C-alpha cells in the first residue's frame, strides 16, 4: 500500500451517508451515488476545482478531502489522473513557484528551515534572513491597525476592489505610512497610493509563465513599450540599487538562471531547453537533453517523510455567516465572461464596456424577484451585515432560489463591500462564496439611475486626478 490513515478516514466518512448530506449539498442521494460510481469506475479520472471550493471557511479541508477521494480510487501517481486546481489567472502557479507566498522561498523551500534561510541569505549576499514567515494580504487591515505592517508595495493587484469587507481594507490602507502601486492602469488601489509606478503590459516584456500543470513556457515581447517605460524587474532592480542593495541584472535570463541554481526542481529548465521543447513541467533537475521534465507527480513515492500518502477528512462545519429573517439570501461572488477579474484592463476597453457597464448585476431567481417585486434590469439595493451597494437585477432561473450571484469587478456595484471577513484559519482566504444578504427594490428608478451616473462620474474623476498627481 502507498497510503496510511485509512481506518481513521473511514470512521468519519461513515457518518456522512448520501441521504444525510442531501440537505447540506442540495444534491439527491441518488445523484451522489451515481457520481461516485462514475468516478470510481473510470479507468482514469481527474478532479478539477476552482474558487467555489477554496473560497470557503473549510476550503483547505475540502481540497484535502478531494485528494483523499483520488487516493481511494487510485487516481494519483499515474498518467491522466490527479487533483488539479483551476488557477484564477495564467501565472498564479508561476507566482507561487517564485516564492510569492508568506512562508516559502522560490521553489517551495520553507522559511522555517534554517538550512533554507542560510542558503538564500548566502546567495543574496546578506548576513541573515528573518525566521518568521510573512503575512497574507487578507491580514493587512488588522496588521496595519496594530503597526505590524507599515507599508505596502502592490504590483498588478487591486485589493481595494477584490478583497473582502472593503470598508476594513480601506481603513487598513489609511493606517499605512506608505503605499506604492506598480501597474499598467489606474485602479481604486492606485488612487489611494502615495507613489504610482507605471509598468509594461504582458505584450511589452518577456519572461516565463508557469501553467497550472507545472509547465514552464517562455513568452516574448511583441511591441516596444512607449514613453521609455520600464519592466517590473527593471523597476525593482533600480529601487533596490538606490536603497543600497545593488541589483545589476542585464536581462531576464540572468534572473532565471539565478533562480534555477537556487531551486533544484527547476534547475534543468534552462532558457535554451525551453526554447527547444517549448514547454517543460517541473521537476526538471538536470540540464541534459535526457531530462525533459515530469509529466505527473508521485510515481514512486509521495512528498511525505515516509513516502506514503495520508488520508484526510474532517467533520463538516457550516459557513460562518448565518441566514436570518433580515438577511435570508446567500450571495456568492463569481466571475463571468465579458470582463476579466477586477476589470482594471478590460474596463478600459470601450467595446466591452458597451456590452456591460456600471453598476453591474445581481443575478437572482425568478421566484425571488416576483416575491420581492423586482423587475429584470431594475436597479436594486443589496445589503449585508457589512455594507450596502446599488446594482442592477438580472432575473432568470439560472440561480437557485435564495441565491444571489454577483461578479466582483464593478466599481459602483462592488459586491466585496458586502462580503464578511470570515477567514480560513489555515490560508486566511475569505469566505467569498457564502454571505448573508437581502435584496431591496427601489421605487424611484429615475433617481436611482441618476445616482449611479453621478457616482460613476465622481469615481472616474478621482482616478483621473490621482493619475495626474
Positions of PLM-derived features:
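A glycine-rich, hydrophobic/aromatic-adjacent loop/helix-cap motif
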Residues: 39-142, 213, 285-291, 300-308
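Long, well-ordered, tryptophan-enriched scaffold segments
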Residues: 1-42
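Phosphate/diphosphate-binding loops
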Residues: 168, 175-178, 182-187, 221-241, ...
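Long, low-complexity segments enriched in small/aliphatic residues
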Residues: 86, 93-102, 119, 254-351
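Long, contiguous, secondary-structure-rich segments that constitute the structural scaffold
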Residues: 226-228, 232-280, 347-363, 367-469
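Short, well-ordered beta-strand core segments
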Residues: 45, 152, 179, 193-198
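Conserved short loop/turn motifs at secondary-structure junctions
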Residues: 24-27, 50-57, 89, 156-161, ...
